[in-house]
């Protein structure tokens, strides 16, 4: 990595942490009560009223990763219907399940939504609004994952840094990455990938990166973006949520 870039990123995170010191972190899913989540996703809650004050420990779309007091979001895919795993999610300790279908058991906490995919983005945007943590957003036609790994490695030398796992960089993966941020994290490095116009605006709204990195402007996804100018316009929207931040 270019030494000047490494020094800049380290100094930027350090300055942000200094500015935010004393404000309180409020990021261990604090504020993510079932009541707040229901409001964030504009959903319909059913179940015990007292459970609405429960704070979530985690949010997942994979029934194999359900945690005690977590939220299981039952996404219906082309081959797998998450709704079939709702009973098992409760048995594994989930405090609540979310789905587009009506609840089959109204005695358990349950949130019905119009779209689970949109609900994931809405929850991530809400949770991100509670986070006082410097975020580096990375995009580009190629080299995103390598650049993410390098920047995370540099920051990890001084800060407890969360990074995107694998290529969880789309409108499903980014929210799941945001949900992994915990109280001990001091910085986050988020990879953001797109293939069409409009996607970056939605991703940037979720991630709200303090510092943005574009690796390059190539010829990927021209079937949707038209030409390299289209790629440039689409990727440049990474900073739209925080236009005064470093870019």
Where are these regions (language model features)?
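Short "domain-exit" segments at the C-terminal end of structured domains
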Residues: 242-247
């Amino acid at each position: 990595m270019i030494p000047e870039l490494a020094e800049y990123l380290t100094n930027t995170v350090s300055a942000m942490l200094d500015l935010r010191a004393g404000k309180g972190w409020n990021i261990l899913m604090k504020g993510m009560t079932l009541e707040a989540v229901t409001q964030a996703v504009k959903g319909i809650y059913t179940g015990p009223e007292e459970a609405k004050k429960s704070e979530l420990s985690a949010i997942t779309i994979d029934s194999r990763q359900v945690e005690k007091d977590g939220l299981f979001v039952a996404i219906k895919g082309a081959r797998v219907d998450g709704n079939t795993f709702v009973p098992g999610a409760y048995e594994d300790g989930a405090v609540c399940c979310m789905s587009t279908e009506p609840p089959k058991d109204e005695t358990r906490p349950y949130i019905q939504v119009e779209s689970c995919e949109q609900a994931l983005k809405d929850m991530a945007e809400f949770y991100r609004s509670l986070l006082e943590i410097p975020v580096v957003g990375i995009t580009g036609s190629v080299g995103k994952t390598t650049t993410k790994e390098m920047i995370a490695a540099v920051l990890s030398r001084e800060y407890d840094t969360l990074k995107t796992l694998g290529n969880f960089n789309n409108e499903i993966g980014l929210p799941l990455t945001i949900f992994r941020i915990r109280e001990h994290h001091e910085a986050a490095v988020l990879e953001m990938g797109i293939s069409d116009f409009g996607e970056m605006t939605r991703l940037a709204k979720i991630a709200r990166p303090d510092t943005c990195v574009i690796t390059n402007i190539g010829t990927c996804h021209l079937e949707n973006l038209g030409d390299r100018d289209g790629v440039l316009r689409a990727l440049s929207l990474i900073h739209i949520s925080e236009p005064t931040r470093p870019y």
